[in-house]
């Protein structure tokens, strides 16, 4: 009987809301650090194990997901989504650029167990580009062992294109391997509440409760930047497309898509909601049936903001100098990283080390930044998903309405 009860409890924990569990871990970590400093320092091992598991799985995750995605790409499907695709990419880059501006206007710092002396900063854009090029030609095994994400991406893309010519059995094997790695990531993420409990406890015990204010500032910068993109940048892009007041459409998408996505924290889970909203807006079915799932995959403005803000927070903490060309390059890299963050639990956080590589930040420190992301993830991930998913339907609606108006004007002229 006791075994059945224990099994039932474990099942409820495994199937329970990860957001609520992380919130509980966060609160318990704060309480333990407040009650007993020695005990809080002792449970820091849980956080260390969690970060170690993330470090172990992240390089393999990037390799398998990108390789499987390219190898299993379907050819021959004709769609009229070029304007939407352009808006997706432009919106993601604009979000990354806004995050760079926000991060320099309101610089955030983190509590990391390293100093600037541990870092050899790049002297400028030329050295950054040279480092990127050298990383691209790294041995694949060496890239995996040293978490060289640029090299991993190059090999994943190359192998993915090569495997397009392979037989279906090989493609299925690659896809199954990708699913297996994704399962391992989900398994690691399920331990996030325990890891966050250990990280928060040990961090507060060693640095004091003032750390929370540092995270509060980081959250304000992150969420403030997302609000800026949702309420200013995206409306500007929509106005450029439809040439009229964009806010009725913007607020409709935030209300009927963003709110759902905020609580589900999954762009994929929000696809049916976006489809229903597109139907309600009388959009072209052939267009939105393709653009909405595509948007859930590559339209990642929120992820671009998260990657940029947290990377620059690490840069500011370590005192690494950043010139304007390097900051612009970070916007491009963050946009590309964001497009690869879909379908992965905590995907945007796990791609932060790739952006950190640009500034010579070691993987150990980059994973501490990822851990900070998980600590604030209760709000960060919800806001990020709400921005991502609502933007999918917003840009789809803007492109469809612009095309309808163009056809109507052409009909009137003829």
UniProtKB/Swiss-Prot annotation:
GO terms for biological process: serine transport; threonine transport. It catalyses: L-serine(in) + Na(+)(in) = L-serine(out) + Na(+)(out); L-threonine(in) + Na(+)(in) = L-threonine(out) + Na(+)(out). GO terms for cellular component: plasma membrane. It comes from the Bacteria. It is found in: Cell inner membrane. One of its GO terms (molecular function) is neutral L-amino acid:sodium symporter activity. It is a multi-pass membrane protein. Keywords: Amino-acid transport, Cell inner membrane, Cell membrane, Membrane, Symport, Transmembrane, Transmembrane helix, Transport. Its main location: membrane. The chain crosses the membrane at residues 16-36, 46-66, 84-104, 143-163, 180-200, 219-239, 300-320, 332-352. InterPro entries: Na-dicarboxylate_symporter, Na:dicarbo_symporter_sf, Ser_Thr_transp_SstT. Pfam families: SDF (PF00375). PROSITE patterns: NA_DICARBOXYL_SYMP_1. Belongs to the dicarboxylate/amino acid:cation symporter (DAACS) (TC 2.A.23) family. Involved in the import of serine and threonine into the cell, with the concomitant import of sodium (symport system). This is Serine/threonine transporter SstT. The gene is sstT.
